[in-house]
UniProtKB/Swiss-Prot annotation:
Protein name: Bifunctional purine biosynthesis protein PurH
Organism: Methylobacillus flagellatus (strain ATCC 51484 / DSM 6875 / VKM B-1610 / KT)
Reaction equation(s) it catalyzes: (6R)-10-formyltetrahydrofolate + 5-amino-1-(5-phospho-beta-D-ribosyl)imidazole-4-carboxamide = 5-formamido-1-(5-phospho-D-ribosyl)imidazole-4-carboxamide + (6S)-5,6,7,8-tetrahydrofolate; IMP + H2O = 5-formamido-1-(5-phospho-D-ribosyl)imidazole-4-carboxamide
A biological process term (GO) from this entry: 'de novo' IMP biosynthetic process
Presence of the UniProt keyword Transport in the record: no
UniProt KW keywords: Hydrolase, Multifunctional enzyme, Purine biosynthesis, Transferase
Length: 528
């Protein structure tokens, strides 16, 4: 145990710092501080010594040089167990500093502002703070280093139980957290500055990217039992994203549960109307809109009852008791909704293994992050990473082009836009038959588009669903007319696709021959 006798506190985020400093003062700890933090302490009656008075060297360069002094870093780096260190410090008049409490200039928050300039960013690069944190973290055997307000109460609790001391285990854990914070901070600076070109313009893909992830949990195993796995989140997760989920009940989430739950949640939250999405192996096997969650679920389940067994079910509106009763009649791995009524939760209490997740819907805004979406997607390849801007493109009726002689009715257009939205979340090659606000057949992941079309039609037939008058979405263009021939024979009346094939004329002619409506979006939604 190391008793805390002297602490240096210098924070930008002053959350909880008054209470923490008062508690230290009650232990008889001498408090050193700088600038605004010192003023805050004085104004609240907490005894404090300004760092400039302690070092005998004034702050200079608009506060850029405050703590970069041998009396500070010597007090942090000197090892108490080495006689030569102790002798040197005594000769130089350098006392020990047993604790520092430092959080850094808000660089990340500054550059996150849309109006932030390069000058703003530079002025928010902390120098003295990280230097002190590194010194203290290196000498964790003797010094406790706190870098976040969330650490205050735990440290105080230990000090209260030990008469004002911290344990070696606590100091080591604080040291690791401190180095993680410095790494993340420097990574954010590197990422931001690397994104600038020589002429001052920004580059979407900087010369170096520093991955900054935080472990959420270890997993029992990976995609298969022989693989090890863990779940990590972004340092600053988007509101309404899967990692913000609260698990209300059920077994621990598996690797596959998480992957499938993300696919279901991303799809369902793209709808404004009440919707239900059922996912199996990261592919939607049933999607529907309804006046109520119950109606949406019943319609989604009709698409493919066989595949829905053991699936992931997601809703974008509060799940009520009626919908919960219906869902509870089938085997479900994970259930997701923004909220649940008390009646719904009571239903699932009898199904203790069902993993019930609650995720608040994103607040919305101009950026993908504010809408709960990734701004970029990554994919690992051999010793490398592919990075692309995320596929967050959405279309409306104003963005489409009718390329056939026949024009869509309002009802057809509504079904086509619904089908197009679903197809975006189906693995390529993707074909989706829809009608009346629900999927009727889904063909996913085939190497040829015509095979996906045939499979989607067979799925509908197996489920006893008629495709007469249905709408079809294809995530990419039809390379030949054969896919159009198959969907027309199945009963479709209209189709939406990107267009762009060298055989577009042939494909459009086939649609005209069958009396179909065909719409081009000029946007492709490959998903691999």
């Amino acid at each position: 145990m190391a008793v805390i006798k002297r602490a240096l506190i210098s924070v930008s985020d002053k959350t909880g710092i008054l209470e923490f400093a008062k508690a230290l003062a009650e232990f008889g700890v001498e408090i050193l501080s700088t600038g605004g933090t010192a003023k805050l302490f004085r104004d609240n009656g907490i005894p404090v010594t300004e760092v400039s008075d302690y070092t005998g060297f004034p702050e200079m360069l608009d506060g850029r040089v405050k703590t970069l002094h041998p009396k500070i870093h010597g007090g942090l780096l000197g090892r108490r167990d080495l006689p030569e260190h102790v002798t040197a410090m005594q000769a130089a008049g350098i006392p020990d500093i047993d604790m520092i409490v430092v959080n850094l200039y808000p660089f990340e928050a500054t550059v996150a502002r849309p109006d932030a300039t390069l000058e703003d960013a530079i002025e928010n690069i902390d120098i003295g703070g990280p230097a002190m944190v590194r010194s203290a973290a290196k000498n964790w055997q003797d010094v406790a280093v706190l870098t976040d307000a969330s650490q205050y109460e735990e440290v105080l609790a230990e000090m209260r139980s030990t008469g004002g001391a911290t344990s070696k285990a606590t100091r080591f854990a604080l040291s690791v957290a401190a180095f993680n914070r410095i790494s993340n901070y420097d990574g954010a600076i590197s990422d931001y500055l690397s994104s600038f070109n020589a002429d001052g313009t920004r580059n979407e893909f900087p010369g170096q990217i520093n991955g900054r992830l935080v472990k959420v949990q270890d997993l029992r195993y990976g995609e298969n039992p022989h693989q090890q796995a863990a779940f990590y989140r972004d340092l600053y997760p988007a509101p309404g994203s899967l990692v913000t989920a609260q698990q209300l009940q059920g077994k621990e989430l598996s690797y596959n549960n998480i992957a499938d739950a993300d696919a279901a949640w991303e799809c369902v939250k793209s709808f404004d109307s009440t919707a239900c999405v059922i996912v199996k192996h990261a592919n939607p096997c049933g999607v529907a809109l309804g006046a109520t969650p119950l109606e949406a679920y019943q319609k989604a389940f009709q698409t493919d009852p066989t595949s829905a067994f053991g699936g992931i079910i997601a809703f974008n509106h509060t799940l009520d008791g009626a919908a919960a009763e219906a869902v509870s009649k089938q085997f479900v791995e994970v259930l997701i909704a923004p909220d649940y009524t008390e009646e719904a939760l009571a239903v699932f209490k009898a199904k203790a293994n069902v993993r019930v997740l609650k995720i608040a819907l994103p607040v919305g805004g101009d950026s993908p992050w504010s809408r709960g979406r990734n701004s970029h997607d990554t994919k690992r390849v051999g010793s490398g990473v592919l990075i692309q801007t995320a596929d967050n493109h959405e279309i409306s009726a104003a963005d489409i082009k009718v390329v056939t002689k026949k024009q869509p009715t309002p009802e057809q257009l509504e079904d086509l836009l619904f089908a197009w939205r679903v197809a975006k979340y189906v693995k390529s090659n993707a074909i989706v038959f829809c009608g009346n606000g629900m999927t009727l057949g889904v063909g996913a992941g085939q190497m040829s588009r015509v095979d996906s079309t045939r499979i989607a039609a067979i799925k509908a037939q197996n489920a006893g669903l008629s495709l007469q008058g249905s709408a079809v979405a294809s995530d990419a263009f039809f390379p030949f007319r054969d896919g159009v021939d198959v969907l027309a024979e199945a009963g479709a009346s209209c189709v939406i696709q990107p267009g762009g094939s060298i055989r577009d004329d042939e494909v459009i002619a086939a649609a005209d021959e069958h009396g179909l409506v065909m719409i081009f979006t000029n946007i492709r939604h490959f998903r691999h």
